[in-house]
Amino acid sequence: LKARPTATMMPSAMPAPPEQPAVLDPLRVMRLGSASLERLAREPEKTGRVHSVFERAINVLWRDGHLLTLHGPGPLAAPFAVALERLPTRGSVAPGMSIESWNFDWRDAERVALEMPDGPLGFAADALPERAGAQALRSPAGARARQALARGIAAGDARALADAACALIGFGEGLTPAGDDCVLGALAAVHRLAPGWLAAHTGQRDRLAEAARTRTTDLARDFLLEALDGRFAEPVLAILTALSDDLVGDAARRVLAMGASSGADTLCGIRLGCRALEARVARR
């Protein structure tokens, strides 16, 4: 892709604001992934900082250089999400504010497995609804990259997959560019239906990881790095593990409600990956 809208880059560290709330109420954790729990407990002497604050989520740049996304009760919206009993009150948290392990109370938290289990689909790929997503993916350049991604997956060509995915990473605008969402969806299908395939091609996997680290936003970076390791948000897991056409339709509608177009773009990648892998099997 020769012309690409510039992804909105978030700084990897935020300066401390001139004033901070004196005390942050304890953050009672209800649910989190096992990997996130390990991250919370690691290196307790170091400090994290609030990265960005939204109405329904707070991103924390943790001391390992990657994000934790705090949100209220419900399904984990990211593989690095932490579902709290309630979010801090508006105005009590600001970008740059220090946050440490002792701010969290995870003693009674449910540990959630966010790794994609391998196995066949319990639904027809054509049962996944189609919804127009971001304009970037529907542009000629976006369509060419999506087609190249599908061809690489269908052919079992890890280099072609990586070429197409690298072209999509950072393509589009927003906190998670449309191209990144599409790649994430395709990786979810790969981990479900072709487990170990990408891991067996370490050079191509490393190319994707490097593109995630250098070509997109902080939030999209961490979604993609987690996806390369086989970890996904609960709504994405619910789609790939659905046991019937009706259930996958319900799960897909929940994903479609995510963000302005992120859900549709992720679903585009899931559908693309599932169809491509079905085509690969049919040719054997």
Where are these regions (language model features)?
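Compositionally biased low-complexity segments, especially N-terminal hydrophobic helices
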Residues: K2-M14
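Short, solvent-exposed segments of well-ordered alpha helices
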Residues: E173-G174, M258
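Intrinsically disordered, low-complexity segments enriched in glycine/proline and serine/threonine
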Residues: K2-P5, A113, L184
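Short, hydrophobic/amphipathic alpha-helical patches that form generic packing surfaces
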Residues: G170, D181-R192, T241, L267-A276
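Phosphate/adenylate-binding glycine loop and adjacent helical scaffold
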Residues: P11, P15-A164, L168, G174-G179, ...
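Acidic, carboxylate-rich catalytic segments that either coordinate divalent cations
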Residues: P235-R284
